[in-house]
From Swiss-Prot:
Part of the 50S ribosomal subunit. Contacts protein L20. This is Large ribosomal subunit protein bL21. It comes from Streptococcus pyogenes serotype M1. The keyword Ribosomal protein applies. Belongs to the bacterial ribosomal protein bL21 family.
Length: 104
């Protein structure tokens, strides 16, 4: 069984394995930079370790592959019979990270 981990980043929990590419909320790091995730909730594999709330001394190391924005989401509000309307778009920024190592 391959080793995996569950990390907390950007207010979400993400299951990761070595070599996997994940999309997370924007991290302030340039492409090619190495990032370390310290909030490891669970490390699984041959022996599963569950944190309370995090696993002590466990880290997940990854490399930032790119920064980008998701597809545009358009919101449109209007008031009937009043001629009032509002159109707004939003593109959420993200960071693509490739997982290099899980240190438990």
């Amino acid at each position: 069984m391959s080793t995996y981990a569950i990390i907390k980043t950007g207010g979400k929990q993400v299951k990761v394995e070595v070599g996997q590419a994940i999309y997370v909320e924007k991290i302030d790091a340039e492409a090619g930079a190495e990032v370390t995730f310290n909030e490891v909730v669970l490390v699984g594999g041959d022996k599963t370790v569950v944190g309370t709330p995090v696993v002590e001394g466990a880290t997940v190391v990854g490399t930032v592959e790119k920064q980008g924005k998701q597809k545009k989401v358009v919101t449109f509000k209007y008031k009937p019979k009043k001629g009032s309307h509002r159109k707004q778009g939003h593109r959420q920024p993200y960071t693509k990270v490739v997982i290099n190592a899980i240190n438990a």
